[in-house]
Amino acid sequence: MTISPPESGEKNKKVLEDPVKADPRPIDFAKLDKPGFWSSKLSKGPKTTTWIWNLHADAHDFDVHTGDAEEATRKIFSAHFGHLAVIFIWMSAAFFHGARFSNYSGWLADPTHVKPGAQQVWAIVGQEMLNADLGANYNGIQISSGIFHMWRAWGITNESELMALAIGAVVMAALMLHAGIFHYHKAAPKMEWFQDIESMLNHHIAGLVGLGSLAWAGHCIHIGAPTAALLDAIDAGSPLVINGKEIATIADMPMPHQLCDPQIIGQIFPGLASGTGNFFSLNWLAFSDFLTFKGGLNPVTGSLWMTDVSHHHLAFGVIAIIGGHMYRTNYGIGHSMKEILDSQQGDPILFPAPKGHQGLFEFMAESRHAQLSVNLAMLGSISILVSHHMYAMPPYPYIATDYMTVLGLFTHHMWIGGLFIVGAGAHAGIAMVRDYDPAKHIDNVLDRILKARDALISHLNWVCMWLGFHSFGLYIHNDTMRALGRPQDMFSDSAIQLQPIFAQWVQSIQASAVGTFLLAGTSEALPHKALSEVFNGSLVEVGGKVAIAPIPLGTADLMIHHIHAFQIHVTVLILLKGVLYARSSRLIPDKASLGFRFPCDGPGRGGTCQVSSWDHVFLALFWMYNCLSIVIFHFSWKMQSDVWGLTGGNFAQSSITINGWLRDFLWAQASQVLTSYGQSISMYGLMFLGAHFIWAFSLMFLFSGRGYWQELFESIVWAHNKLKVAPTIQPRALSITQGRAVGVTHFLVGGIATTWAFFHARLFGLG
């Protein structure tokens, strides 16, 4: 079993006096020639095929590489720079494709008719048919990342600017790689620096988030918003005039650096040319032309107003800079996280914990897995919130009418959120096994939760059963009634209604707030446009397509939402059980000594397999996948039916039966991917079949046991020996845990890629 290594380093010195250690570890390229160099066992090389799997399992498990927590933390810190380098290279590739292989200029000139493309297929074996006619004399593969819409919002108007960004991103990647090497080999931070929580919060909140948002606000104000104003005027057919010249095309537009000239910018936003005097005299109304609170969507682009976005980033940046300074660092004032936590007591009636939150600060500060768990849970939740905001409040010009991009980005952010939340459960389990010391948590809230785990899990189990039987039961009832020809006895908007009254109430109070509530600090009533149109608003149309419209809710939504609730609760049940029972259970009291992942509790103990914390993560991944599949199916059909007008509003009556989901969603909408051969979307037909194969391949790992394969290998090795071609590396069947890992990976990749092909072919096929 692996336990996180103990801390090292001096505790008494002030952190800022000596925060780094110089030349702690020389650069040694010889290690790169020896896979598994961190382990004496792995570094000897493979004797059996199990070696390669152990290499993969432990490559990033820094706890097993070193006996020093400081060293492990430095590796994590250094790896962050490597991660940033990969991100910059990825961004550079996107910019380069936009600069070299895309129709960005053509799309920018006519975004309602030209489709975005940034890749052209070479005619090697006849696959050039994948290059569709996307308009503007461009043939290529249509993309759905939303990157063109984002570039337009940034204020990028030509391919030269994209090439400059591509070069800049490569330079940044090189700097990040250098920083990763430098801060591990040349000037590595000490443990005290990593443990200086208040200083970290100060720099992350005020520095990274606050100053980052403020800097982006500066770009939006000086480049993004003026460029958007000029482009919007061109698209609306009423171009602006600058210095007596009509800006009728993109070629007529001023260069980005010219937009910083007060004489030019003053003709677009007079407030921007008014100087800083108004700022220091608090006459901020002078800036209300470029820092707005219009609300709603720009009718030309179907997206949020760029001046509203500028205002948002400015306000958020200021709030974060102020908020980042509320922690006690150098001057003895402000909050101490330890004092805050240690002073919090448990509720004396509902949750008696005599020692309250004592010990939690140390646990969170010292356990990297506990920190990662909380961060993953929060970031995953934020990703899911982002996915919902992107269609309700479209941030980028013309993105709302690019339906494939809207659906793709919703799906993308939902998957990210789900994977991160499962990751939160995984690292919480590792933290409990490796970092949790029961002696330091006697009678605090964490200890009390662990003592109440049986009540928590049994009640959560009851909730899952209740939700599952009732929500699924509604569908079974409806299928039965429809099969028997009794529509009057079904749960539907036209028979026995189950209206989502609470959700409808939330929608109505949003809408009723218009004109009645006053904006803070003013006598102005809340304007209608301050709300998303999905809350009983009005339809916004761009280029003859619906950008956003009110989203009505009815019986069908209540039914599927209770399926969502059921699946979310089961996923949480599995993850929470894996965390609360990570160290011990009635079945295996000494589970902590077995580690985070183990197949069974040794020979002679039947019925103790698949109980490790790792196995709970394994099971939760399946439930997360099932849960999010229904969520993205619901979103796809609901938007096509009730907002975009593509399926004749059939969601309310068809989705209330299981047969309706199979017939009118899966089967009917799969027609595009199944009939894609011979068209430019034929790759999605191939992907649909290939991804099904990958998914089916996973079942081989999930259904059959280790012994079956080992028995088969023995026979195959015997045949090789007979032919005198015996392998030097002895074949070994995958362990139980390895088989499950390979199985769930192929299950998820196959399922996600199948959905990807299904969604893309559907909406690309409809044009």
From Swiss-Prot:
PSI electron transfer chain: 5 divinyl chlorophyll a, 1 divinyl chlorophyll a', 2 phylloquinones and 3 4Fe-4S clusters. PSI core antenna: 90 divinyl chlorophyll a, 22 carotenoids, 3 phospholipids and 1 galactolipid. P700 is a divinyl chlorophyll a/divinyl chlorophyll a' dimer, A0 is one or more divinyl chlorophyll a, A1 is one or both phylloquinones and FX is a shared 4Fe-4S iron-sulfur center. Gene3D superfamilies: Photosystem I PsaA/PsaB. One of its GO terms (molecular function) is electron transfer activity. Divinyl chlorophyll a binds at M700, Y708. The chain crosses the membrane at residues 76-99, 162-185, 201-225, 309-327, 368-391, 407-433, 455-477, 558-576, 616-637, 681-703, 741-761. The keyword Oxidoreductase applies. One of its GO terms (biological process) is photosynthesis. Coiled coil: none annotated. InterPro entries: PSI_PsaA, PSI_PsaA/B, PSI_PsaA/B_CS, PSI_PsaA/B_sf. It is a multi-pass membrane protein. Divinylchlorophyll a' binds at H692. GO terms for cellular component: photosystem I; plasma membrane-derived thylakoid membrane. Pfam families: PsaA_PsaB (PF00223). Its EC number is 1.97.1.12. It is found in: Cellular thylakoid membrane. Phylloquinone binds at W709. Residues 1-22 are annotated as: Disordered. Keywords: 4Fe-4S, Chlorophyll, Chromophore, Electron transport, Iron, Iron-sulfur, Magnesium, Membrane, Metal-binding, Oxidoreductase, Photosynthesis, Photosystem I, Thylakoid, Transmembrane, Transmembrane helix, Transport. Belongs to the PsaA/PsaB family. The PsaA/B heterodimer binds the P700 divinyl chlorophyll special pair and subsequent electron acceptors. PSI consists of a core antenna complex that captures photons, and an electron transfer chain that converts photonic excitation into a charge separation. The cyanobacterial PSI reaction center is composed of one copy each of PsaA,B,C,D,E,F,I,J,K,L,M and X, and forms trimeric complexes. PsaA and PsaB bind P700, the primary electron donor of photosystem I (PSI), as well as the electron acceptors A0, A1 and FX. PSI is a plastocyanin/cytochrome c6-ferredoxin oxidoreductase, converting photonic excitation into a charge separation, which transfers an electron from the donor P700 chlorophyll pair to the spectroscopically characterized acceptors A0, A1, FX, FA and FB in turn. Oxidized P700 is reduced on the lumenal side of the thylakoid membrane by plastocyanin or cytochrome c6. This is Photosystem I P700 chlorophyll a apoprotein A1. It comes from Prochlorococcus marinus (strain AS9601).
